[in-house]
Every structure is written in structure tokens, then in C-alpha cells.
Design a protein with these regions (language model features):
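Short hydrophobic beta-strand element within catalytic cores of glycosyltransferases
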Residues: 318-322
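A charged, aromatic-enriched C-terminal amphipathic alpha-helix characteristic of glycosyltransferases
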Residues: 182, 186, 356-389
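Conserved donor-binding/catalytic core segment of Leloir-type glycosyltransferases
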Residues: 145, 190, 194, 198-200, ...
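Short alpha-helical donor nucleotide-sugar binding micro-motif in glycosyltransferases
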Residues: 288-293
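Conserved acidic donor-binding segment of nucleotide-sugar-dependent glycosyltransferases
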Residues: 334, 338-345, 353-358
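Short acidic/histidine- and often glycine-rich active-site loop of Leloir-type glycosyltransferases
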Residues: 269-270, 324-335, 340
């Protein structure tokens, strides 16, 4: 734990949603799990339409550094209080670690003390990577950290060589042995006479789905057949709407299967008997959900951290991911723990194979469990993080 060995301040904004930058948290300092979190108000809302128009213009026309800085300002977040805090206090920090290359707080914050700055750029294949602004930021900073090996080709293709570069990766909490006593710890998980009855009176209950892995989740949500799980925000630009369309095509020939959606709902969900909304779940229930699933679905093309996919692998559930997500594909290839798709037809074929081939699922699931145990340890990821920051302190 970094907090046990270092004094850590987290500087962030009061706005949880980058699509609006609306302030929803109180400004000021708070302790969260032993970490001092300082929140600063965002002064300008995000104008999505104006930002989209500027992005399109800069992509197709010659532009200046001033145009790039205006693009950064419009992307946001505009948090002048955060930048003023850095200007006053940066000498009290051994290192300043910034996450996401292109946001205004990173561009303005690294300019305060580049000699103390480490950047985790969170690189995605976007036309804006060609902006000259990023090269100057990387060249003046003291280190670059990467979450995924998929970022490295982009870093080397578009940005200058950094003095210190580290593939830090990510960690996943170890999957503890989840037990399912006759009387669950949570009263809602207790066995009742109704637990042995299907939600649809005409749907037969398969005892295979009421024993073993994921029992509490299946009982609570009355899930008695093949189950695919999506964990993440349900929004218009992260692949979840496409997932709903693809699963609808799959369910036309596989009516027994259910898709469970686990996360914040920000788009309308179609009225479909094959789709269930579980909402936002705490860690323990989330792990029960991954164990209950036959397959976890990862449709986002932009999720470099791929946390839902990795949590699924950690408990031994194989995944089916979008081929557009280089980080997810990299994990699945290295782990040999799932499949990926590039079209609706490939999605339907791959999900059909995974749902109907028990031995394949078991083999992929065990591969994923071993991969998480060997390569997704938090102590190893934090050790690499400290090594990167330590180099900055010594330079």
C-alpha cells in the first residue's frame, strides 16, 4: 500500500463526469481510505458540440499551437484552484503524477514543475495524438508510466523518447475463496422456498445453476440459465449500446441466455426479457457476479485498464472482448483466457461457442486465473510505480 510508505495527496475535481464537468462533490479536503483527497471546483462546463466541431477542424486543417491549447481548454476540466495549489505547494512534493495526457489539468499542471512530473498518458489511437503539444510535454517531464503494453507503439510512434519509461501495468485484488454456506451471511442471499422456483413459471430450473460458483448472485437475481455479464458504465460512447444490439442478435437463436448489466445506467435499456439490470454492486457482490457468469463481455474500445475483464479472469470466468480494444486483446492473448470479435457475426459465433462448450470455458477460465495470479499482483505493479517515481526523485 503506497499510503503506508508515502505521504500521498490526490488532487482532483468536484466533477465525476467528463461529459459535462458538472460539480457534484463538495470542494475541499477529505480522507478516503487513509488518503488525503483535495477536490477543486470546475469553472467551465463541457460544450460537447463546440468541442466536436473544433476537433473536426483541427483534424482536417493546418493549425497552430494556440489552436491545440484551445482544444485542451475545451476538453477540460478547467480547475484553476487545482493549478494554483500546485503553484504554491509543488516544492513540498517529491513527485507530481498526472493521469491522462490530454486533459487540461495535466497540460497546465506539468507546466508548473516539469522537473517533478511523471505522466501516465493513457494513450489511445486518436488523431489528436499528432498534436505537437504532447511532444513538448513528454520531453520536459521526468518520466512516463504505461498501464498497458498496447500504449507502447503509440508512445514511440507519436511522442519523443522519455528519459524514464516504465510499463507499470495494473493489479487486481486476489480472488479469495468464496464459500456458499446454507445460510448466507447476507439475509438477502438466504435460501427460501421461492429460491427453488423460476421467475417465469414455465421456465424449468436447472439445478446446475443453483449449485457451486456464483450461487448468491444467481439466487438473488433469479437466473437459472446461461449467463453473460457486462460490468461497466452503460453509456452511448463506450460500446455498451452496440453490445445490446449484438446480444439481441445472439438471443434470436439462443433464447435461454440472459445478459446481466452491472454498472451505472446512463442510456435507456431496451425492454427485453433476456436483459437484466443489476446496477452498481459492491466488491463482494461484484465478485459473486463474475463467478456466476459463464462469460464476461468487454465491448469498450477505450478501456486501457480493462478492470472488469481482469476481475473476471481472476475468478476464472473467460471473457469475450472487442477487437478494437488493444489492451483487452493483449491480456486475452497472453492469458489464453478468452476470445475477441470485430463484427456482429463474430460476436454471435464466439459467444455461441463459449456458451455451449463447457470444457473450453473451464480451460480458458483456469488459464485466466493463473494469469491473474502471476501477472496482475498489486505488489508488483506498485513496485514498478515506486521504481519510476524513485528515478524522478534521484534525477
Amino acid at each position: 500500500d503506497l499510503v503506508e510508505r508515502h505521504d500521498v495527496d490526490v488532487l482532483t475535481t468536484c466533477a465525476p463526469d467528463s461529459r459535462t464537468w458538472k460539480n457534484e462533490y463538495a470542494e475541499g479536503s477529505d480522507k478516503i481510505r487513509g488518503v488525503n483527497v483535495r477536490r477543486f471546483a470546475v469553472k467551465e462546463p463541457h460544450d460537447h458540440d463546440a468541442f466536436t466541431r473544433l476537433t473536426s477542424r483541427l483534424r482536417s486543417e493546418p493549425h497552430t499551437r494556440a489552436d491545440e491549447l484551445e482544444w485542451v481548454r475545451m476538453l477540460g476540466p478547467s480547475a484553476p484552484g487545482l493549478i494554483e495549489h500546485l503553484k504554491r505547494q509543488h516544492k513540498h512534493y517529491d513527485a507530481l503524477v498526472f493521469f491522462s495526457l490530454q486533459h487540461a489539468t495535466t497540460v497546465q499542471g506539468t507546466a508548473v514543475a516539469p522537473e517533478r512530473s511523471v505522466i501516465f498518458p493513457y494513450l489511445l489511437p486518436r488523431p489528436s495524438l499528432r498534436f505537437g503539444l504532447w511532444s513538448d510535454m513528454i520531453a520536459s517531464s521526468r518520466g512516463v508510466g504505461l498501464f498497458s503494453a498496447a500504449e507502447r507503439p503509440l508512445l514511440h510512434a507519436f511522442l519523443p523518447e522519455s528519459g524514464h519509461e516504465e510499463l507499470v501495468g495494473v493489479g487486481i485484488e486476489p480472488a479469495t475463496q468464496l464459500t456458499y454456506p446454507r445460510h448466507q451471511q447476507d439475509p438477502n442471499d438466504a435460501v427460501t422456498p421461492d429460491d427453488d422456483l423460476p421467475s417465469d413459471a414455465e421456465a424449468p430450473v436447472s439445478e446446475d445453476y443453483l449449485s457451486g460458483r456464483g450461487v448468491p448472485f444467481r439466487r438473488r437475481h433469479r437466473l437459472y440459465g446461461p449467463l453473460a455479464l457486462y460490468g461497466g458504465r452503460l453509456e452511448s460512447d463506450n460500446g455498451s449500446e452496440e453490445l445490446l444490439e449484438y446480444f439481441d442478435a445472439y438471443s434470436q437463436t439462443n433464447p435461454d441466455a440472459t445478459l446481466v448489466l452491472m454498472g451505472v445506467k446512463m442510456v435507456s435499456i431496451p425492454d427485453n426479457p433476456h436483459i437484466r439490470l443489476a446496477g452498481v454492486l459492491p466488491y463482494r457482490d461484484r465478485m459473486f457476479a463474475y463467478e456466476a457468469a459463464d462469460v464476461t463481455l468487454a465491448p469498450s474500445s477505450d478501456d486501457l485498464l480493462a478492470q472488469p475483464l481482469l476481475e473476471s479472469l481472476a475468478v476464472g470466468t473467460p471473457a469475450l472482448a472487442s477487437a478494437r480494444n488493444a489492451a483487452a486483446v493483449e491480456h486475452l492473448r497472453r492469458a489464453e483466457a478468452g476470445l475477441y470479435y470485430g463484427s456482429k457475426e463474430e460476436f454471435v459465433d464466439a459467444l455461441t461457442l463459449l456458451m455451449t462448450n463447457t470444457k473450453l470455458r473451464e480451460r480458458l477460465g483456469e488459464n485466466g486465473r493463473q494469469y491473474a495470479r502471476l501477472h496482475l499482483r498489486w505488489d508488483a505493479a506498485l513496485g514498478r510505480f515506486e521504481r519510476l517515481v524513485g528515478r524522478v526523485k534521484r534525477s
